[in-house]
UniProtKB/Swiss-Prot annotation:
Residues annotated to bind ATP: 224, 315, 346, 375-378
Protein name per Swiss-Prot or TrEMBL: Phosphoglycerate kinase
Broad class of where this protein is predominantly found: cytoplasm
Quaternary structure and partners: Monomer.
Reaction catalysis annotation: (2R)-3-phosphoglycerate + ATP = (2R)-3-phospho-glyceroyl phosphate + ADP
Top-level taxon in the UniProt lineage: Bacteria
Species this protein is from: Porphyromonas gingivalis (strain ATCC BAA-308 / W83)
Amino acid sequence: MTIEQFNFAGKKAFVRVDFNVPLDDNFKITDDTRIRAALPTLRKIIADGGMTIIGSHLGRPKGVAPEFSLRHILPHVSELLGVDVLFADDCIGADAMDKAAKLKAGQVLLLENLRFYAEEEGKPRGLSDDASDEEKAAAKKAVKAAQKEFTQKLASMADCYVNDAFGTAHRAHASTALIADYFDRDHKMFGYLMEKEVKAVERVLHDIKRPFTAIMGGSKVSTKIEIIENLLNKVDNLILTGGMTYTFTKAAGGRIGLSIVEDDKLDLARDIVKKAAEKGVNLILSVDTKVADRFDNDAATQVCSNMEIPDDWMGMDIGPRSIEKFRKVILESKTILWNGPTGVFEFDNFSIGSKAVGEAIVEATANGAFSLVGGGDSVACVNKFGLADKVSYVSTGGGALLEAIEGKTLPGIAAIQG
């Protein structure tokens, strides 16, 4: 069933969204992108005359914690939807059940943070650090049993289930996956955002226009190893950049000064270089780097060879020759995946490389390439430089997107697709 086909008139819909938005010290939303992304789905249900029950998490609470209450975002959700959204001070308690039961056509109810309950994630809480294996096993068994009852209560509020939370699709949580078992195929579906995310990933994985270039940044090669190895079976060009570059440089015998490095991953870096060559993948690493004498926007800087970074200096961004090298490859590409910046883009003096990569992707997109940007830092990059609406798709899912591209089955997607 698709959301477009479904008529919500007279139906109660439990909609799992990802309203895990950043809040400042006064609990004001600093970036409402995730809320806005869910609006088309919520508006469709309202317009049909359905009754909407919104479930989400916020942060990583270890129990009921006022600072993580979804009440903080209630006024903004009401404003964006143009309706007076009701609030339940629990997600499965009497208040939630009562308000859900009394909903009328067009009304919207926001439940309190689902993660106030350990049952949402299905992980025990409150175990002491020195708990025995038996105690851990008993606690896990207890929370799994309680999770079933928790999931049943969430499902009992609604006639249908809509998952529009791609950001948590890689989690087999109560509200993201398990709840789907309580609805038949005709009464569970993706929301519009989830549909777009799934299509974007499928296009990158299965409907590839070549040349296909992946740009992987970030500070650690160890956190990207699975996705890098999966991409080596798919891409024509793999650009590795960001902090992980210096592990490759050191592995090749270069001098990296004070640059970030994973000394225990040098063999892994050499193995990736070898595998790329064996598979005929064009592996592109930076050739020059903008270095600083300290980790500061106002530090003294110079540009030097990647292989010859002075002893007391650290790599902070790619240099002009690397920018030109990356740009040439990107402009020749027809499918582009970007995950991770080229340097410390949060500092304006070291954001030039990331901006240049973003602008090259925009130019390639204008020339007909399909470009997918995903992962927290690269999304922050395109937003910072005003490029988000000039690429093909910006994913809301960090970990979920990476796991999908690694080739893993995402529980939140499998629960709907079967």
